[in-house]
Amino acid sequence: MPFVELETNLPSQNVPQDLAEKLCSATATILGKPRERVNVTVRTGVSMVVGGSSAPCTQLFISSIGVVGTAEQNKEHSAKFFNFLTEQLGLAQDRILLRFVPIEPWQIGKNGTIMTFL
């Protein structure tokens, strides 16, 4: 069950209106998870500084069970997420940061229980 949170200082009018839907589909493909299990949040107009500059930028936080736990996995995922974000947001790669966080099934609650028991 991936959780993906995108924050950008781009104003909403400079971000594709359907970015959350596109990011959901891209995440499902990149991580090899069913689309219906992907959770996406997009926040625009956030006050941000990356590399000492408030020029247009974005951060993408990716957490998931089992697919973001190794350097090899994340190197592959990173290239694909960078391609997606540069295409969708028109930002240079040096204005994009990704953070991968592996999580365990017992750390996610759903339907009155935790994923361990679903």
UniProtKB/Swiss-Prot annotation:
Annotated catalysed reactions: D-dopachrome + H(+) = 5,6-dihydroxyindole + CO2
Transmembrane segment boundaries: none
Listed GO CC annotations: cytoplasm; extracellular space
Domain of life: Eukaryota
Assembly description: Homotrimer.
Function description: Tautomerization of D-dopachrome with decarboxylation to give 5,6-dihydroxyindole (DHI).
UniProt name for this protein: D-dopachrome decarboxylase-A
Taxonomic lineage of the native organism: Eukaryota, Metazoa, Chordata, Craniata, Vertebrata
